[in-house]
Amino acid sequence: MDAPVTLITGTRIGIGRHLAEHYLRLGHRVVGCSRNPVDWTRDGYKHYGADVADEKAVKAMFSEIRRSYGRLDHLINNAGIASMNHSLLTPTSTVNAILATNVVGTFLLSREAAKLMKRKKYGRIVNFSSVAVPLKLAGEAAYVASKSAVVALTHVLAREFAEYGITVNCVGPGPLATNLIRSVPKQKIDRLLEQQAIPRMGTFDDVANTVDFFLRPESGFVTGQTIYLGGV
């Protein structure tokens, strides 16, 4: 059986890079993308420079995937941005950028992936939300709105793609050691952790374990679901 082809967005650093290396170790053929160049490479890994909110770039990337592999088994919509500001201090340009990457990007990648996946009547799509949604975190209005939209999008795409053997699920990580939260005051992180049933920082492996579950062929009866990590 051919090794599965897995596309992961936002693979330059952080969770995305960890997931890319994780699935390479598991024998996947991994395709990654990011707006900026990566400073790493691995056997079996192919990287594209693409903004997930740029429809032309996304379509070009999928044309290359189709030519190179003829298939796509998994899509992990990891790419995301945040801006932690009070709403009164957040410019519209920031809101538009967050929505473009987190919502439009997730939609575009999912749409194009489903076109390729439906040929084989099989596919797994995993989106990324955040515990910021159920916790309704103040100071992150645009980010929370975008990640709420991802949850809603997951529900609808799960229904639309089910007839093609494609499942669509979502993982909502809590605080992780990424660039997104390094500028957040420790007191705010501590208050957030206190609201979790398991009051600790998450790890990249915690995220990978959840994504593993959603990607398994045996998870074919699970779709439209969001798992928030840490117990919120």
Model-derived features with residue positions:
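Substrate-binding pocket helix/loop in short-chain dehydrogenase/reductase
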Residues: 86-87, 91-99, 181, 192
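Alpha-helical segment proximal to the catalytic Tyr-Lys
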Residues: 115, 159-163, 220
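Residue(s) in the substrate-gating loop at a strand-loop-helix junction
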Residues: 130
